[in-house]
């Protein structure tokens, strides 16, 4: 499949989805998109800018959710035009799907909603590439049912995304077997390196996180041979309005991406060991 002008999957080099969890302001969106576009261009990594206009599943009613669909889409359109990069954003059950699909290149469905049949069908009917996040409660082989629903709309541009699985209360773990298992769906497989280190509800009224493990899990995922890496980043994660504890510090990303590119090339240049 293709996103904008580049191929995804089938042993192609990994692509990156990255940006702040939520659109905090137009200035921050432009600054982060510009920086990430420059870094990925220098490294030769295909890039999709990610940020959300609404975070509908925040822990607390008092948490910052975003700038709303109208302002958010206006900013994403400006990012896309200014830096010539594709963009991805989350959609929810009450999102005006057609309106969002006119602007973005990829629609992303939240993990909590992966079993909502009507929601998945309506998103996929927009005819855009869709990144479906696997629920924290779902076995990797059960994603085949989700993919079958999605492709029943005639949309073959479906990706599946691992973002950790619930491990008791307020904790997630990443089963790297999941990435290999989900390849059986025939869809490109994406690893969400930052939500996988989230501690859901770990700070009481908001989620915590362990960003120090993002590099570890990212490298492990590269060893599996993934098609895409999802990594939320922020200029100052400790001041982020959403998911700061598990966001990657933006100004440290270039050196790390360079390492991941080397790992990706090494793994994909080797024959698969069949047992």
Curated annotation (Swiss-Prot):
Q: Which reaction does it catalyse?
A: D-arabinose 5-phosphate + phosphoenolpyruvate + H2O = 3-deoxy-alpha-D-manno-2-octulosonate-8-phosphate + phosphate
Q: What InterPro entries does the annotation carry?
A: Aldolase_TIM, DAHP1/KDSA, KDO8P_synthase
- One matching Pfam family: DAHP_synth_1
Task: Describe which pathway this protein belongs to, using the record's wording.
Answer: Carbohydrate biosynthesis; 3-deoxy-D-manno-octulosonate biosynthesis; 3-deoxy-D-manno-octulosonate from D-ribulose 5-phosphate: step 2/3; Bacterial outer membrane biogenesis; lipopolysaccharide biosynthesis
GO terms of molecular function: 3-deoxy-8-phosphooctulonate synthase activity
Cell compartment(s), UniProt: Cytoplasm
Q: Does the keyword Transferase apply?
A: yes
Q: Which UniProt keywords apply?
A: Cytoplasm, Lipopolysaccharide biosynthesis, Transferase
HAMAP family assigned: KDO8P_synth
Q: Which named protein is this?
A: 2-dehydro-3-deoxyphosphooctonate aldolase
Q: Which organism is it from?
A: Francisella tularensis subsp. novicida (strain U112)
Q: What is the lineage of its organism?
A: Bacteria, Pseudomonadati, Pseudomonadota, Gammaproteobacteria, Thiotrichales
